[in-house]
Amino acid sequence: MSASDFSSAVVVLAAGAGTRMKSDLQKTLHSIGGRSLISHSLHAAAGLNPEHIVAVIGHGRDQVGPAVAQVAEELDREVLIAIQEEQNGTGHAVQCAMDQLEGFEGTIIVTNGDVPLLTDHTLSALLDAHVEVPTAVTVLTMRLDDPTGYGRIVRNEEGEVTAIVEQKDASAEVQAIDEVNSGVFAFDAAILRSALAELKSDNAQGELYLTDVLGIARGEGHPVRAHTAADARELAGVNDRVQLAEAGAELNRRTVIAAMRGGATIVDPATTWIDVEVSIGRDVIIHPGTQLKGETVIGDRVEVGPDTTLTNMTIGDGASVIRTHGFDSTIGENATVGPFTYIRPGTTLGPEGKLGGFVETKKATIGRGSKVPHLTYVGDATIGEESNIGASSVFVNYDGENKHHTTIGSHVRTGSDTMFIAPVTVGDGAYSGAGTVIKDDVPPGALAVSGGRQRNIEGWVQKKRPGTAAAQAAEAAQNVHNQEG
């Protein structure tokens, strides 16, 4: 029988202060790979499809509670909350959780909110090992080349766990053991409930230790076994910023490898960062210095980078995005973006469209084949199909109090340095001359021009700026002109 044939519940411990993070943000809310630490733990728990998930929170619960609720919404399932008013040890934390599991009979897995690399696959293997042979407690263990600081797993000849011995209490013989406690357990619910009632705080810390449940269970004749994780790196806890960075790097390494095995070419994995929710198609090329964040979706045959950051972006098949920062927007199939393009939320670039160098967009819809080649701001605007916006154009959308919309039709050609003073509409097929300030609607097919003939005021610089370098240069040039004349 497998774990899926048995009822299970998962308890996630996340009540600690995490003082070593030296942060106003509660420890489990720090993020790697686009998710908070506790979000990673809750996703792993949900992967078991347990009957119940309980998050035990305490320190910083005003921050952690809403975060847990948000993850529950993402998972589309209930996550129960247990409050540990005083952080009185791991045993006390699980006692608090049991109030939410009244009447539950089955297997309870206890894990932590600061082990972001732990997968549902490993938790499922622990659950399978626990139910395969009836056991009171199954400890998830790991083997380390350097086990210093960890509680050693002592087994008898039958392979049962007889003790978890902390480093400070271990003899030389025990210190030589490389199998250590991960802090993740599977318990028989009834035995756990009974043993928790017997916990005592007669130890150096004056706390209730969850590990004492193992001794109580063995004292009552119940078997305690261990299951060794296939990859010890999954069980690395995060207690400070160094460990946060290390866990983030390892998670990213795994994510990048998965993308490459899925058909993407990543030129330099060391400088490419991909969040866990990102989706990447086949035959994608990702150049160095690229960050793909949030729920970004990359289609097939897309080229991204170098030096590009995309957050919650959707990139259509065959598109190219170079040296661009983009947020919460959509790029159509076979479109080209960059270099040095800033795409702000609410932008949609149609298929075969173009956003060129030093272009900024916000709340802009740009139709199929339309181009904004360079040095332009497009905000609060709609541009039809196959239109071209000249260089250095500005969509002037703010009057000091309110934002206004500009509508550009299809097959429009605007000259360089055109200003669109919103609200304004430019009809299909219209043109504008260079330097035009468009304040009124332009009919379809019309040419818009503004400003009178150029007037040159001779001698203005020498009169108004006498003695300046400009005046001296002008006078010298005029003298040469007069001599040649």
Curated annotation (Swiss-Prot):
Cofactor, free-text remark: Binds 1 Mg(2+) ion per subunit.
Pathway where this protein functions: Nucleotide-sugar biosynthesis; UDP-N-acetyl-alpha-D-glucosamine biosynthesis; N-acetyl-alpha-D-glucosamine 1-phosphate from alpha-D-glucosamine 6-phosphate (route II): step 2/2; Nucleotide-sugar biosynthesis; UDP-N-acetyl-alpha-D-glucosamine biosynthesis; UDP-N-acetyl-alpha-D-glucosamine from N-acetyl-alpha-D-glucosamine 1-phosphate: step 1/1; Bacterial outer membrane biogenesis; LPS lipid A biosynthesis
Catalytic reaction equation(s): alpha-D-glucosamine 1-phosphate + acetyl-CoA = N-acetyl-alpha-D-glucosamine 1-phosphate + CoA + H(+); N-acetyl-alpha-D-glucosamine 1-phosphate + UTP + H(+) = UDP-N-acetyl-alpha-D-glucosamine + diphosphate
Biased composition (Low complexity): 469-478
Keyword Nucleotide-binding: no
Subcellular location: Cytoplasm
Binding site for UDP-N-acetyl-alpha-D-glucosamine: 13-16, 27, 84, 89-90, 151, 166, 181, 239, 344, 362, 377, 388
Protein name: Bifunctional protein GlmU
Organism: Corynebacterium glutamicum (strain ATCC 13032 / DSM 20300 / JCM 1318 / BCRC 11384 / CCUG 27702 / LMG 3730 / NBRC 12168 / NCIMB 10025 / NRRL B-2784 / 534)
